[in-house]
Swiss-Prot record:
Organism of this sequence: Rattus norvegicus (Rat)
Main location: cytoplasm
Gene: Prkar2a
Database matches in Gene3D superfamilies: cAMP-dependent protein kinase regulatory subunit, dimerization-anchoring domain, Jelly Rolls
Reported tissue expression: Four types of regulatory chains are found: I-alpha, I-beta, II-alpha, and II-beta. Their expression varies among tissues and is in some cases constitutive and in others inducible.
Designated name of the protein: cAMP-dependent protein kinase type II-alpha regulatory subunit
GO molecular function, one term: protein domain specific binding
Binding locations of 3',5'-cyclic AMP 1: 136-257
Main function: Regulatory subunit of the cAMP-dependent protein kinases involved in cAMP signaling in cells. Type II regulatory chains mediate membrane association by binding to anchoring proteins, including the MAP2 kinase.
Length: 401
C-alpha cells in the first residue's frame, strides 16, 4: 500500500474544529460542522483585514450598571443590547508566532511537567472563589481542577495597565478576581471599546486555543487582581483532557448493552450531551416519589436500588426501604420514571464511591427513542422482582404512595 500523504493544513483545520466542539458542546456535530466550516470559508474570502472563524459573539450585559462581556450567550440577565462581535485574527492573513508550540489533543502527556506556583491558604481560597463560575472549568473533574489551580499565578494590576494587547502572541489565560477592565478593538486604525469586565469573568483563551494573535486589548480601568494560567498548561489540561474524556465517554457508551442497537452517529450524540457526577458512599442519588429529571449510567462503582415497604417499618416508625436491585458498571437506572412520566418508583444509593454519566430528561426523550422498547420491557421485570420480594404485585406506576 502506498504511503498516504496528509494534506498541508489538514491537522490544524481539524484541531480548530475539535477545540470549538469541546468549547461549545453542540448537540449535533454534523450541523455544527456545516456552520463552522461555512463561516471559515466566508472568512477566507474577505479582504486581508478580515478575521477568521469561528467568530465568537460577545453579548453586552448589564451588571450593577456596568456592561459586562460574556461569551457565547452565557448571560446572567436578559438583555436587548446588540451583539458585539470581537474579531479573531486570521492565521491565514497574519504570521503566527514562531515560538507557539504545535498542539495535538491526542498526543500523550505523561512526560509533561506539571507547573506549580505555591500559594498560601488565603490565596488558594481567593483563587477558588474567583474560578467557581468560569465556564471553561465547568467540565473539569476534581483532579484536573486541582492541577489548574496549582498552575495559576497571581498578577496585581494598576489603573491604565495593559494586560494584553491586540496583535500580540497569546501567553496566558486570565481569571478576574477584582477590578474593572475595558475591552478595546482596533480596526482600520480606529480603536473602540466593545465592552467591560466588572470584577468577574475571564479572558485570553481564544489566542491560546487557536494559536492566533490577541483579538483585543484589555486595559485596567481600576487597580485589580488577576489569576493567570500559562499557555502550555491551559492547552494540556483543559483542551487535551477534555478531548481524552470525550474519547473515554465514546468507548464507554459503545460498551453499554442498551445502546448496542444505536447507530454510531446516535451514540455520538449521546456523548455530546452526557455529564459526569461523582457520589460518595451512602449518598442518595435519586429519591422515591420525587419528580424525575435525569437518567443515569454507572461508569464505575455500584448502586443499590431500594423501595419503601408497605409492610415493614424502620426504627423510627416509617416505611423501611428494601433493596430490589443492585447495579454495576455499565448498567443504568432512573429510566422508569422518564418512560412512564411518573415520580421516581425507587431510591438509589451509592455503594462505595460511584461515578455516573448523567443525561437530562430533554436529551433522554430526544435521543433514546430507539431504546424505549427495551426500557419499557424492564417495567414488567421490575414487577416480577417485587412479587418475589413482597408476595404481591405492587403498582410501580404509582410510586408516591
Amino acid at each position: 500500500m502506498s504511503h498516504i500523504q496528509i494534506p498541508p493544513g489538514l491537522t490544524e483545520l481539524l484541531q480548530g474544529y475539535t477545540v470549538e466542539v469541546l468549547r461549545q458542546q453542540p448537540p449535533d456535530l454534523v450541523d455544527f460542522a456545516v456552520e463552522y466550516f461555512t463561516r471559515l470559508r466566508e472568512a477566507r474570502r474577505q479582504e486581508s483585514d478580515s478575521f477568521i472563524a469561528p467568530p465568537t459573539t460577545f453579548h453586552a450585559q448589564e451588571s450593577s450598571g456596568v456592561p459586562v462581556i460574556e461569551e457565547d450567550g452565557e448571560s446572567e440577565s436578559d438583555s436587548d443590547d446588540e451583539d458585539l462581535e470581537v474579531p479573531i485574527p486570521s492565521k491565514f492573513t497574519r504570521r503566527v508566532s514562531v515560538c507557539a508550540e504545535t498542539f495535538n489533543p491526542d498526543e500523550e502527556e505523561d512526560n509533561d511537567p506539571r507547573v506549580v506556583h505555591p500559594k498560601t491558604d488565603e490565596q488558594r481560597c481567593r483563587l477558588q472563589e474567583a474560578c467557581k463560575d468560569i465556564l471553561l472549568f465547568k467540565n473539569l473533574d476534581q483532579e484536573q481542577l486541582s492541577q489548574v489551580l496549582d498552575a495559576m499565578f497571581e498578577k496585581i494590576v494598576k489603573t491604565d495597565e495593559h494586560v494584553i494587547d491586540q496583535g500580540d502572541d497569546g501567553d496566558n489565560f486570565y481569571v478576574i478576581e477584582r477590578g474593572t477592565y475595558d475591552i478595546l478593538v482596533t480596526k482600520d486604525n480606529q480603536t473602540r471599546s466593545v465592552g467591560q469586565y466588572d470584577n468577574r469573568g475571564s479572558f485570553g483563551e481564544l489566542a491560546l486555543m487557536y494559536n492566533t494573535p490577541r483579538a483585543a486589548t484589555i486595559v485596567a480601568t481600576s487597580d485589580g487582581s488577576l489569576w493567570g494560567l500559562d499557555r502550555v498548561t491551559f492547552r494540556r489540561i483543559i483542551v487535551k483532557n477534555n478531548a481524552k474524556k470525550r474519547k473515554m465517554f465514546e468507548s464507554f457508551i459503545e460498551s453499554v448493552p442498551l445502546f448496542k442497537s444505536l447507530e454510531m452517529s446516535e451514540r455520538m450524540k449521546i456523548v455530546d450531551v452526557i455529564g459526569e457526577k461523582i457520589y460518595k458512599d451512602g449518598e442518595r442519588i435519586i429519591t422515591q416519589g420525587e419528580k424525575a429529571d435525569s437518567f443515569y449510567i454507572i461508569e464505575s462503582g455500584e448502586v443499590s436500588i431500594l423501595i419503601r415497604s408497605k409492610t415493614k417499618t424502620n426504627k423510627n416508625g416509617g416505611n423501611q426501604e428494601v433493596e430490589i436491585a443492585h447495579c454495576h458498571k455499565g448498567q443504568y437506572f432512573g429510566e422508569l420514571a422518564l418512560v412512564t412520566n411518573k415520580p421516581r418508583a425507587a431510591s438509589a444509593y451509592a455503594v462505595g464511591d460511584v461515578k455516573c454519566l448523567v443525561m437530562d430528561v430533554q436529551a433522554f426523550e430526544r435521543l433514546l427513542g430507539p431504546c424505549m422498547d427495551i426500557m419499557k420491557r424492564n417495567i414488567s421485570h421490575y414487577e416480577e422482582q417485587l412479587v418475589k420480594m413482597f408476595g404481591s404485585n405492587l403498582d410501580l406506576l404509582d410510586p408516591g404512595q
